[in-house]
Amino acid sequence: METVRLNNGVEMPILGYGVYQVTPEECERCVLDAISVGYRSIDTAQAYYNEEGVGNAVRKCGVPREELFITTKVWISNGGYEKAKASIDESLRKLQSDYVDLLLIHQPFNDYYGTYRAMEEAYKAGKARAIGVSNFYPDRFIDLAEFCEIKPAVNQVETHVFNQQVKPQEIMKKYDTKVMSWGPFAEGRNNFFSNEVLKAIGEQYGKSVAQVALRFLIQRDIIVIPKSTRKERMIENFDVFDFTLSVKDMEEIAGLDKKESLFFSCLLYTSPSPRDIS
């Protein structure tokens, strides 16, 4: 498995398994399937309501905890120093672990400065190996990064072929912060899976549209966490390290970029419910 080195030296798999919209009832089975396929990075969140399923799978899978990379996120309602601090301990209890590998602020709302301070303390206490943010557009990201003690290791944002986050990624690089993609398949929107450019490129390599889309992001040094509840799709999504897109391929896919969200008209100023956003 290829990894990326975060700004504190921690190695993180560049490909992981996301459990957004995976029900609590099926989460344990899905994570066990993903680990059996070869995934070692699992992305969950307080707002997904399935941290316990992830924890059960990690306990039962037979893979040593230190070989797994677990990410969770502090939700808006747990924002602020005191609430965030308590919620981090609750997440660890549900995950049945003394630590998470990556701890993120889920949204730039509520008192996210206080939230981040609680996360910095968790990091120093060994409860998180790395910390970062999610859904922080450049202005909010810079505002936090300039005034925090520990620079965010990751910013998880909507990133796919139709919203490639090119300029935001350039800004993140200045802080040595990695971009992590949620929604790498755009949840099928904009006729993603029938896109002619992706199909034509995939035919050259004997790969699917999904595999081409993941490979494109990986070659841009973007962490990806595709989600599927079907094991055969987990296998397909995992099989992206035996080919390399050419410069021409990358340029053609770059031409698909619309530079706007397919999900929200203004993510910064609209606070969605936890069921509506990864």
Predicted regions and their residues:
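Acidic-and-aromatic substrate-binding clefts and catalytic sites of carbohydrate-active enzymes
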Residues: V22-E25, A45-G53, S77-E82, P108-Y113, ...
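A short, structured active-site edge motif that brings together acidic residues
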Residues: E66-N78, D101-P108, N135
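Short, acidic/polar
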Residues: T23-D33, G80-K94
